[in-house]
């Protein structure tokens, strides 16, 4: 993705990232609001090459570690939903909402990776009373939830192999998996 930058654009934008990951809405916004080709003649060629490389990644490449699996999970937010899904999920407003969700998560992942890559672990939590369970609407996006399950399992396995997960944290991860299933 760093190839989508030059002296005028020192970093690829979040819209570049999400467009490469398949968001048609991100592509539309890039073209209509920013039009990077206007300031950089080689942008479209470079973009198409990077997108082609990303599209050709194997599932093993997409899920080789926690970072790439997280990105793979976000890719599922970029889909356009076919007939049969609720109408409110099949319009531009929904695509914009999903794009904002993916961009927010990507920004947090990038932030954590850059700033906290070598962070030491800290014990969290206390003896507080559990809050009441809240019920609400769950978006019918099974692909995203399946990828989150995969990400959670991969995280647990990686931490277990390094003796970096306590029994209580493992139980919390299993609860997350159960909730997502």
Region annotations inferred by a language model:
Residues 1-181:
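Polar/charged low-complexity regulatory segments
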């Amino acid at each position: 993705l760093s190839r989508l930058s030059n002296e005028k654009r020192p970093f690829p934008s979040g819209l570049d990232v999400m467009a490469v990951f398949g968001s048609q809405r991100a592509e539309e916004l890039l073209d209509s609001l920013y039009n990077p080709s206007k300031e950089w003649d080689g942008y479209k060629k470079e973009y198409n090459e990077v997108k082609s490389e990303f599209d050709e990644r194997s599932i093993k490449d997409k899920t080789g570690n926690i970072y790439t699996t997280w990105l793979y999970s976000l890719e599922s937010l970029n889909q356009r939903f076919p007939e049969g899904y609720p109408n409110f999920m099949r319009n531009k407003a929904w695509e914009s909402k999903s794009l904002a969700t993916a961009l927010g998560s990507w920004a947090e992942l990038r932030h954590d990776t850059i700033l906290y890559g070598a962070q030491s672990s800290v014990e969290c939590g206390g003896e507080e009373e559990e809050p009441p369970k809240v019920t609400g609407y769950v978006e019918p996006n099974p692909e995203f939830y399946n990828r989150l399950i995969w990400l959670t399992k991969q995280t647990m396995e990686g931490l277990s192999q390094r003796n970096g997960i306590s029994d209580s944290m493992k139980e919390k991860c299993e609860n997350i998996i159960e909730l997502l299933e």
